[in-house]
Amino acid sequence: MLTHANWQEPNINFQVDEMYRGALEVLRWSYQEYGNEIVYACSFGIEGIVLIDLISKVKPNATIVFLDTDVHFKETYETIRRVKEKYPQLNIVMKKSALTLEQQAAQYGEELWKSDPNQCCAIRKIKPLHEALSGTKAWISGLRREQSPTRQQTNFLNRDDKFKSIKVCPLIHWTWKDVWRYVSKNNLPYNPLHDQGYPSIGCEHCTKPAFTMDDLRSGRWQGSGKTECGLHE
């Protein structure tokens, strides 16, 4: 089994087919390799919807972890409800921070997402994912190379030093058009905020409509110089 501890660049030739761009083959390999020791950390954005549908074809009872920061859009929670209805066999885990918003405010001050967004992400996303990945060997992410300059070197299989894990990224060759074409063709439920200028959706306080569709993440942490929550750095 390929793990963080024994990592070497895998000599696996995944075929980038026309229909799935390699994603389905990567998922089949991943669940065969890791079984129940792999989870999908999903934000329920549009890429996440595609991956959930693909995962359901490979492992209908797969574990999907949503990092519930308690400050997501109501549309995001409604999307999760609709996904649960469509895929009742999936094990969707709502993973929260150990600190409530009230406890966080008492310890770090009100509106930490403004005063120190990195600390806020660490408390409400990074630490909870560390906890969710405890006992697993790998996790799946919806990263695409097209999303941002920081993601252009992402491979199907990546050694993740932050979480001491293998990060599997099946959608690296998918374009924005590929994603939407798949969602439309298969009539999949998705977050309606995508139709309102939000190509990338995170917490409500830190997500605005994108400045430009040339930078799909330009609506995240606007004005802060921050482009990633820390999960993929």
Swiss-Prot record:
Q: Which reactions does this protein catalyse?
A: [thioredoxin]-disulfide + sulfite + AMP + 2 H(+) = adenosine 5'-phosphosulfate + [thioredoxin]-dithiol
* EC code: 1.8.4.10
**One Gene Ontology term of the molecular function aspect:** metal ion binding
Question: So which domain of life are we looking at?
Answer: Bacteria
What Gene Ontology terms for biological process does this UniProt record contain? cysteine biosynthetic process; hydrogen sulfide biosynthetic process; sulfate assimilation, phosphoadenylyl sulfate reduction by phosphoadenylyl-sulfate reductase (thioredoxin)
- The residues that the entry says bind [4Fe-4S] cluster are 120-121, 203, 206
Q: Is Protein biosynthesis a UniProt keyword of this protein?
A: no
Query: What does this protein need as cofactor?
Result: [4Fe-4S] cluster
Q: What family name appears in the similarity comment? A: Belongs to the PAPS reductase family. CysH subfamily.
The record's remark on the cofactor is: Binds 1 [4Fe-4S] cluster per subunit.
Q: Which NCBIfam families match?
A: APS_reductase, cysH, PRK02090.1
Q: What class of enzyme is it?
A: oxidoreductase
What's the protein called, per UniProt? Adenosine 5'-phosphosulfate reductase
* Cell location: Cytoplasm
